Regions:
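Short secondary-structure boundary/capping segments
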Residues: 94-96, 328-329, 362, 409-412, ...
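Auxiliary tRNA-acceptor-end handling modules of aminoacyl-tRNA synthetases
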Residues: 25-317, 335, 339, 350-473, ...
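Sec-exported extracytoplasmic/periplasmic mature domains
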Residues: 330-341, 371, 491-492, 496, ...
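Conserved catalytic/binding loops enriched for acidic/polar residues
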Residues: 465, 472-477, 502-886
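Solvent-exposed, polar/charged alpha-helical surfaces in well-ordered, non-transmembrane soluble domains
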Residues: 323-330, 334, 476, 480, ...
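Bacterial Sec-dependent N-terminal signal peptides
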Residues: 1-25
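Zn2+-dependent metallopeptidase catalytic core
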Residues: 86, 320-344
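The catalytic-center signature of Zn2+-dependent metalloproteases
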Residues: 41, 349-369, 480-536
């Protein structure tokens, strides 16, 4: 075979293009080409000690897609590869069936990839195929694709003995393929500074089954750590055993047609670069991830599907919560009925004596897991990497999600201790303009359950503690909260991404109305991170949870699963649906738009906000937090209660303050971002600067509630009762906690520093200066200089009033001064030059005012010492030699 022909064949094998030709045709052409060019093998060999028959003698034979031979007593497994299975593309799906509940949870869907078995000399390679770069198989450029991009070898095994004497089948030791760290536990645990290495000697096969189209393999993998650290879920942290499920399957034959994605609606994508034509604007081809749902009777407007999506409720789900899980799943049928599919989703209960494994990719399972202290849920799904067709989904719900009202912990307070927040880490992250850790995640991550658990904790304690909103049944509260969570996670398994703009479509007054929210819900989408809907108005409150689909959810399903009208092309249908983008009820923005740091530009695209007026919403949350704090001594200091609960409830209010800072600050230098396309009905331009008045309102909100002299004033009686838990736990919390008393100054400094770091963020200040050039000169502008002046006046108001400065304010002023000095003389090119000038001007202003104040004899000793220290720092900064870059 000449070299060029070889490249063509490998290119065809690799690419499996589905852009212009069907997946089935590509696979068949690959098999024919390979078969035609294979050398004819002579399998009749003289007997040897390594004969196929001798190797598998007395072993259990497991026929199926891949024939397996298993000797359980010797823990020996052979995998047979037929000659026509070499170089053929299959799917491999990996699931973690059980974990350690510390770093790795059970039921986690892991890798899903196309692979081939390739014979290289006397070895068989297990190769992950690269499907990200493609071209039509007969295009000349397909040769360049093969030359330019690599596949990945996952593992390899020696061929055992002779080929089968009749069909030439080969045997390999399955341990070399499946008893290895494919889940990358070693790499991931290394991130936590707890690196575990696979111990192959003590890893083994648990169960093997094989069928016509799939082979299912369960293994137990032992990982060890020679320098273990405490891991409270393990009896010995030097050793942990995980179980993994491998599913090997044929690429399913299907008449599924990929659907092109559109940025106006949010779906998970299967994408690749197609180099068949160099005349396209972009090589990217992006498909919506969706299930193959077709009408059984397409001539009718309403029809049952040919093959519905079936979800199984695992038998681990507590009986008392199964109805809520079922309700959350079936809510999506409302959206499918609107596009003409009746009963698109079916829910079944996994029996206690089920013989199938929930890790089997043929079953979509809602699973209950235990990971102490982690109230979370995730809803991953798996898509055909060639077409975007979804074929498997699992949802994992942590048991602690519904244990929120029993939690007793000190972790939250520990994280805001002055020992932690007064370090240089937060300051360095500010001036280096580092992304928060959570913003390095991709769009597949979901933390809704964790946040919802905290929201439910706050809401329940507020309702039960203040009694402002009347009585409520705890069981119904938990039921509705679980429905809210499940419908969100099922949405992910249907292909929908987060929509963090959906909560901005209803007015504050509408959200207070029970009648309105019962009809319309509390948000535009279940795919937002929706807080519990609480009102500071004691006379009216809407429903608490989103237990119905929102307007956006119907739209997203219509785009992904709807059917073109008779005579209408797919392209025209999709454009008609997507062009509804300007509808105020269909607002969309997703993970990369909703950053809570200064890189998030749109204040209406945030997590944990609500209403058309987020600032008003957060003003309500501040009121609620203070009412909760005021109720602590009255409602929680009673016989039978414990002081640690008071400490925990107090921390819930702090959490509300922290959220309000991150999202309210987004208005300052903010830009409303829209996804409309040119020509859309009522189309809007992509960017609109937030009005100057709204930016001022945001700064005033933060000044009043976080930075002002009156922002924090707590009763000593309350502070002296905020005790931590003193009984031991598996984590050793009683030993690790750095402050037994409540670190009130550290808490306040955390909130105030967070505010300043956000407002003075380099990216925000660059954007504010740019925004001044994007607004008509006749319009009111909120400028960077105005923000500097406003913050300086708020933080240092005592020097104008000639007042003593309290402890909270002294800490605030130290942080502010440190930031100004750094901007003025150590900017390191991160800050705009105008910001550097303004910082220096602020230092000169403060130098003059503080000089006068130090002469006053009426000031207390703290204030005098504080002012003298500040003046010394300012003098040194203004007289400092500037760095070379100046």
């Amino acid at each position: 075979m000449n070299q060029i022909l070889k490249y063509i064949i490998i290119g065809i094998l690799t690419l499996n293009s589905v852009f212009l030709i069907g997946q089935k045709d590509v696979i068949e052409s690959i098999e024919k080409d390979i078969e035609r060019r294979k050398p004819k093998l002579n399998h009749s060999k003289s007997p040897s000690n390594n004969s196929y028959e001798d190797i598998v003698k007395d072993m259990d034979e497991i026929p199926g897609l891949f024939k397996m031979y298993w000797d359980k007593d010797k823990d020996k497994v052979y995998l047979e590869i037929q000659q026509n299975q070499l170089d053929k593309v299959f799917f491999c799906d990996v699931t973690r069936s059980s974990g350690d509940a510390f770093m790795f949870d059970s039921g986690a869907m892991l890798q899903s990839f196309p692979f081939i078995f390739k014979k290289v000399g006397s070895r068989i390679q297990f190769i992950h195929q690269n499907v990200y770069f493609r071209a039509e198989p007969d295009a000349a450029i397909s040769k360049a694709i093969d030359n330019s991009f690599s596949h990945s070898i996952i593992g390899s095994a020696s061929i055992e003995g002779d080929p089968h004497p009749k069909n030439g089948a080969l045997l390999i030791d399955a341990k070399d393929i499946f008893i290895q760290d494919i889940p990358k536990v070693g790499i991931i645990s290394g991130y936590f500074k707890r690196k575990y290495n696979l111990d192959k000697r003590n890893s083994y096969f648990n169960e093997i089954t094989s069928f016509t189209n799939n082979t299912e393999i369960d293994v137990s993998l032992h990982f060890k750590n020679n320098k273990p650290k405490s891991a409270y879920t393990l009896p010995d942290p030097s050793s942990m055993v995980h179980k993994y499920h491998f599913s090997l399957s044929n690429i399913p034959e299907s008449d599924f047609e990929p659907r092109m994605a559109d940025d106006r609606v949010g779906h998970f994508l299967t994408m690749y670069q197609d180099y068949s034509s160099l005349m396209e604007d972009s090589p990217y081809v992006r498909y919506v991830n969706r299930w193959h749902l077709e009408k059984a009777e397409p001539r009718f407007e309403m029809s049952k599907p040919k093959k519905p999506i079936v979800y199984w409720i695992e038998n681990t789900v507590p009986v008392e919560y199964r109805d809520a899980v079922r309700e959350g799943i079936l809510l999506w049928n409302n959206a499918f009925e609107k596009i003409g599919l009746q009963g698109a989703i079916i829910v079944k209960q996994m029996p206690d004596d089920a013989e199938w494994d929930p890790g089997d990719v043929r079953y979509n399972v809602i699973r209950w897991i235990i990971r102490p202290g982690a109230g979370y849920a995730v809803g991953p799904s798996k898509a055909n990497p060639y077409t975007g067709e979804l074929y498997a989904a699992d949802i994992r719900v942590s048991s602690d999600y519904v244990r929120f009202f029993h939690r007793k912990y000190t972790e939250f307070i520990e994280t805001i201790d002055a020992k932690n927040m007064d370090s240089d880490v937060a300051f360095d992250n500010w001036w280096k303009n580092k992304l928060p850790q959570d913003e390095n995640n991709d769009g597949n991550s979901c933390e809704y359950a964790t946040e919802k658990m905290n929201e439910m904790d706050f809401a329940w304690n507020y309702i039960s503690g203040t009694e402002n909103l009347g009585d409520i049944d705890l069981q119904q509260f938990v039921h509705d909260g679980l429905v809210d969570l499940i419908v969100h996670e099922v949405g992910h398994t249907l292909g929908l991404r987060h929509n963090f703009k959906a909560s901005s479509i209803f007015t504050p007054e509408q959200l207070k109305s029970k009648e309105f929210t019962e009809k319309h819900g509390v948000t535009g989408s279940v795919m937002d991170y929706n807080p519990v809907n609480l009102s500071a108005d004691k006379n009216s409150n809407g429903k608490y949870f989103q237990t119905q689909l929102g307007y956006y959810d119907y739209w997203a399903i219509e785009y992904a699963y709807g059917f073109p009208n008779k005579g209408e092309s797919e392209e025209d249908y999709l454009e008609t649906v997507a062009s509804k983008v300007s509808d105020p009820y269909l607002q969309f923005g997703t993970d990369e738009d909703a950053r809570s740091s200064s890189r998030g530009i749109d204040p209406t695209c945030s997590r944990h906000d609500m209403s058309t007026d987020p600032i008003a919403y957060y003003n309500d949350r501040i009121i609620l937090a203070n009412e909760l704090w005021d109720s602590i001594l009255d409602k929680f200091e009673k016989e039978g209660e414990q002081y640690p609960k008071m400490r925990r409830v107090f921390g819930l209010g702090v959490s509300e303050y922290a959220r309000s800072i991150a999202n309210t600050a987004k208005f300052v230098g903010g830009i409303y971002h829209r996804r409309d396309h040119v020509g859309d009905p009522n189309g809007r331009i992509p960017f609109e600067i937030v009005s100057a008045d709204k930016q001022r309102e945001a700064v005033q909100f933060l000044s009043k509630n976080i930075l002002s002299q009156d922002a924090f004033n707590f009763s000593p009686d309350l502070l002296n009762k905020l005790a931590p838990e003193r009984l031991g736990d598996f984590k050793g919390t009683t030993w690790r906690i750095s402050r037994i008393d409540f670190p009130i100054r550290g808490m306040v400094q955390y909130l105030q520093s967070k505010t300043l770091y956000s407002l003075y963020a380099p990216v925000r200040m660059h954007r504010m200066l740019d925004n001044e050039l994007k607004i008509n000169s006749r319009k009111d502008k909120y400028t960077l200089s105005e923000m500097f002046e406003s913050l300086r006046s708020e933080v240092w108001q005592e020097i104008d009033k000639r007042q003593n400065i309290n402890s909270y304010r002294r800490e605030l002023q130290r942080v502010h001064l440190k930031m100004l000095i750094h901007m003025a003389i150590k900017s390191n090119n991160q800050f705009p030059r105008d910001a550097i000038s303004l910082a220096r001007a602020d230092l000169e202003y403060l130098q003059k005012r503080i000089s006068r104040l130090t002469k006053l004899q009426s000031l207390d000793s703290y204030t005098k010492a504080h002012m003298a220290e500040n003046l010394s720092k300012i003098d040194a900064a203004l007289n400092a030699q500037l760095p070379k870059e100046f």
